[in-house]
């Protein structure tokens, strides 16, 4: 049985929730069959929005930070899942090279790295940290908020060019916790004898949100048929616009007209189900991450009325990458609250196992806004006691 998260949404069960609960045995079997055909991501985190009438993933991170925000009670589950995941790729693994993001001054992110090292060390692996940054030329100590140290070491290629590791450390598996927004690292390309997880093409230099949601659209149709619900209740509508330049206004007409089309589709669904909320669209950089390059739009005219500050925010994202492609996503309200502040659940998986989650809470935001923004904090999600593993 998959552990059940405890939700902050109180009140009577919505029709969607009833259907999911009633179909639990069929859902478990469906997942079992799907995992036999498809390889799950090595690990991921999924942002969910729960509007009661609709429960949908709105973002999936294949290089998840934030493991430090999970409840420590879930650590044994993470270790168990990590063991199973590593055994798939390298049953004889002894050494694991973990490659974190480059922003080593972010204390919260470093705590995530510490937790990941803890998880994989408890599987029995030797774990060390590597970097492809040209600034890391020797073992470099990185101070943690609690006064302890991490050591970051330069990645080197083996003499035959077929493996990568550290000077005196030959890993079976290389685990990326770096989303490669700035481009693919040449030092990890064309490795023939090691598993690089997730694969390089999962990084933002290649991956696009619009491709992800096109694939999810197919999955949602199958799943909706299985539990007898409209797939729309599990899946946000989306569209895509390319050749955008927020600074010189090029592509603006295309963006505004596509926002109009999407809003009309959402209004039609809201009318069908008697939903009184006001529809909105979230415009995101198609290769965006860290909550950057995101804006909420309730009317197409807002696209043409962006001020300089808003344009600057949309034009450039992580690692200075310029935005030229955007995904337009149906906005999903969140009706969940923690201590009267708006909240959304973020669920973490290793391989096919749910290993925990937390509420992203933001007192400065409303139910129709992006919560991954300044002012947010995290509250670990508990699992329902009777389902914990």
Feature roles, as predicted:
Residues 39-42, 120, 167, 339-342:
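Short solvent-exposed loop/turn micro-motifs enriched in small/polar/acidic residues
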Residues 95-98, 174, 281:
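Conserved hydrophobic helix-helix packing surfaces used for dimerization/oligomerization
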Residues 26-36, 324-332:
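Short Pro/Gly-enriched beta-strand edge/turn motifs at strand-loop
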Residues 86-103, 374-389:
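Conserved catalytic alpha/beta cores of large enzymes that bind or transform nucleotide phosphates
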Residues 80-81, 104-277:
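Conserved N-proximal alpha/beta basic substrate-recognition cap immediately N-terminal to
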Residues 1-28, 38, 44-45, 51-56, ...:
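Low-complexity, highly charged intrinsically disordered N-terminal segments
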Residues 54, 257-280, 286-383:
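Phosphate-binding site of ATP-dependent enzymes
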